[in-house]
Structure formats: structure tokens, C-alpha cells
Design a protein with these regions (language model features):
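Surface-exposed, charge/polar-rich loops and edge strands
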Residues: 1-187
Length: 187
């Protein structure tokens, strides 16, 4: 569906035109709207300016557009979203030294969730599901971004995994300590 703020019904042409230029796989409930503004030309200019790019598979859930209707933000129900990372994605993240700035909140949630999966793996838990409040429940000394991603990469290599699929309901609200992202590009 289209986001509610467009105030119109879905048209058949939306299935082709309401997509990012880099969309490859089907499965999302909605398009990741922050990426809709990027054209092939804009992506090329960013690359020429020295910005490194990598692409994730995001299956945006209906909850993306769900308003918060509770007084206590912790009580807000988050929908699970499926996220997929390739071994190449992990290799890129492990080797990257600079800031990571995702396009859109779904990408941000995916990257932050990936970090927390590395934390879980380091503790012997290989279930790739990040509960809504998991990050707020862990204040112990935590691994760096690269250490967490290296744990995941080693797990993938040891188990012959080319593509890692998980689910997240991570909820980022004031007080969250970012482990991966240092900014965001969004609309």
C-alpha cells in the first residue's frame, strides 16, 4: 500500500513506479519511502563524490506507518520486519572505518538490529530475532561495531551461510545508544 500521507488509493501503476531504483526483490508490504528520491544519476554522483554504497534487502512492514497511540512509548506495539544481509554486506561493514549513514528508518533499524544480533551471537544465542526492547536491556560492556559484525561474519563463514535472514521489532526512541549509524538520510 501507499503510505497514508499520500491520501489516495493504490493504482496499478504504483507496483512499478512506487519503487526505489535499486529495488530487486519482492516481499515488502510497502516501499522504503526515503529511497524513492534517489535516481540512478544521484547515486552515481554520490559515488563519484566518494560516498560508498551498499544495498540491503528490506521487507518493510505495515507497522512502519502505524501511529503511536499510547501514552507510554514503551507500550507501542512494533511489527516485525524481515531483514536480509549477504556475506558481502558483512564483509563491507567489517572493513568500513568511517561513519555509516543509512537511507531511511527501516535501513537504520536493520543495521542497528544486525549489531545486536552480533551481541546475541557472542553470548551463544544464534536466533536472529531482535525484540523491541532488547538494546535497552543490555548495559554491560559491549563489542564495537566491527567486533559485532566480525562475530556475525565468522558465524556465516563457519556455517556456510551466504545470506542471513532475521527479524526485528527493534524500537528506537529517545535514550537509544546508536551502535552503528551516525546519521540518517530520510524524507
Amino acid at each position: 500500500p501507499l503510505p497514508p500521507y499520500l491520501n489516495r488509493e493504490t493504482e496499478s501503476s504504483d507496483y512499478e513506479t512506487y519503487q526505489t531504483v535499486y529495488s530487486e526483490k519482492k516481499g515488502a508490504v510497502a516501499a522504503p519511502t526515503a529511497g524513492l528520491h534517489f535516481t540512478e544519476r544521484v547515486l552515481q554522483k554520490l559515488q563519484e563524490a566518494g560516498f560508498k554504497q551498499d544495498f540491503l534487502t528490506l521487507h518493510v512492514g505495515a507497522g512502519t506507518f502505524q501511529p503511536i497511540k499510547v501514552e507510554n512509548i514503551v507500550e507501542h506495539r512494533m511489527h516485525n520486519e524481515q531483514i536480509v544481509f549477504s556475506r558481502k554486506n558483512l564483509q563491507t561493514l567489517v572493513q568500513h572505518e568511517g561513519p555509516i549513514i543509512p537511507v531511511g528508518t527501516t535501513s537504520m533499524r536493520a543495521l542497528e538490529s544486525l549489531y545486536w544480533f552480533g551481541v546475541k551471537l557472542g553470548k551463544g544465542d544464534s536466533e536472529f530475532f531482535i525484540e523491541k526492547l532488547y538494546p535497552y536491556q543490555h548495559t554491560e560492556i559491549l563489542p564495537s561495531r566491527q567486533e559485532s559484525f566480525a562475530i556475525i561474519l565468522k558465524f556465516m563463514e563457519s556455517n556456510g551461510i551466504e545470506e542471513l535472514t532475521g527479524e526485528t521489532e527493534i524500537f528506537i526512541f529517545p535514550g537509544y545508544q546508536f551502535k552503528v549509524c551516525r546519521g540518517i538520510v530520510t524524507n
